[in-house]
Amino acid sequence: MPAYDIVVFDLDGTLIDSDDALVRPFLTLGMAQEDITFGHPIEEFCAAVGIDVDEYVRLYDTDVVEPYPGATELIDGLDRWAVCSNKHPESGTAELVRLGWTPEVALFSDAFGGAAKQLAPVLDLVGVEAGRTLFVGDTAHDARCAEVVGCDFAWAAWNPRTAATNPPGTVL
């Protein structure tokens, strides 16, 4: 694998196991388990299913979120790392603080106007070209995000949901 100047991570399903925390508010608000999907901007998904995003965030419990085994050691071993996530900024920031993680930059859904995450603003803030960046994620949305800016992508296969899909390309 080539050397990179920075590694940018998605957060949910990539560095942290947040599936339970993401699902609980939707279930509490009356949504069926089978209708809940991952990888979307939270504002868009809530609007699409008729749930108030503020109510969802109020019910979201950051204390049930845990890093995947080895995630802390992985980021501790990096000189530069950042986060680019569709997560709501309130819960995303709270999780980073609780875990004691301090990425160089952390952009959440509010940075993208509630739309799908974009790597270009992260790269602008860190001053690194796409060709010198690795984006690590767990969904096809993440892979497309990397493709749009032309940076390398790797799948976070330590997430069992991702590993089960046998994703193409670079798998960590």
Q: Model-found features: residue ranges?
A:
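Asp-based, Mg2+/Mn2+-dependent phosphohydrolase catalytic module
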Residues: 1-5, 82, 90-172
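Short alpha-helical scaffold segments that flank and stabilize functional sites
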Residues: 10, 28, 49, 74, ...
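A sequence-level detector of short, solvent-exposed, charge-rich linear segments
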Residues: 26-27, 34, 44-45, 75, ...
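N-terminal helical cap/lid subdomain that shapes the substrate entry/recognition surface
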Residues: 2-73, 80, 88-90
